[in-house]
From Swiss-Prot:
Annotated transmembrane regions: none
Principal cellular location given in the protein's record: cytoplasm
Primary role: Binds to the sigma-S subunit of RNA polymerase, activating expression of sigma-S-regulated genes. Stimulates RNA polymerase holoenzyme formation and may bind to several other sigma factors, such as sigma-70 and sigma-32.
Recorded coiled-coil stretches: 90-111
Compartments it resides in: Cytoplasm
Keyword Transcription regulation: yes
Region feature (Essential for activity): 99-122
Keyword Transit peptide in annotation: no
Protein known as: Sigma factor-binding protein Crl
Matching NCBIfam families: PRK10984.1
Family: Belongs to the Crl family.
A biological process from GO: positive regulation of DNA-templated transcription
InterPro entries, per the entry: Tscrpt_reg_Crl, Tscrpt_reg_Crl_sf
Length: 132
């Protein structure tokens, strides 16, 4: 499949995979890509497959000359589902913001190398300052 920008989707998936363990290929559809990060374990006592994590997820949409994004912070539960919930712990919020910024910088550099822009989705209000 070729995206609106003319880039083959399969080639972009490979490049996105090289950014780290963020892309969820099974949740990517058409010109939309899904990334997430399990940044902070809520409780290490349960078995690994039963643990929950604080993290973020990002949806990226390919357009002709740019990719647009939106993201949310929340809880990745033991069933493997994301829920947007308020996070109260300052250390957790700081870690989520840090990992999101790190990923955002890598993603922006990759897309820039392909002559594509990375911009917030038109209806998305950016709660975290991602760039200087």
């Amino acid at each position: 499949m070729t995206l609106p920008s003319g880039h083959p989707k399969s080639r972009l998936i490979k490049k996105f995979t090289a950014l780290g363990p963020y892309i969820r290929e099974g949740q990517c559809e058409d010109n939309r890509f899904f990334f997430d990060c399990l940044a902070v374990c809520v409780n290490v006592k349960p078995a690994p497959e039963k643990r929950e994590f604080w993290g973020w997820w990002m949806e990226l949409e390919a357009q002709e000359k740019r990719f647009t994004y939106s993201y949310q912070f929340g809880l990745f539960d033991k069933e493997g589902n994301w829920t947007a919930v308020p996070i109260k712990e300052t250390e957790v919020i700081e870690r989520l913001e840090y990992t999101l910024r790190e990923f955002h910088e890598k993603l922006r550099a990759l897309l820039t190398s392909l002559n594509l822009a990375l911009e917030p989705a038109d209806n998305f209000k950016e709660p975290v300052k991602l760039t200087a």
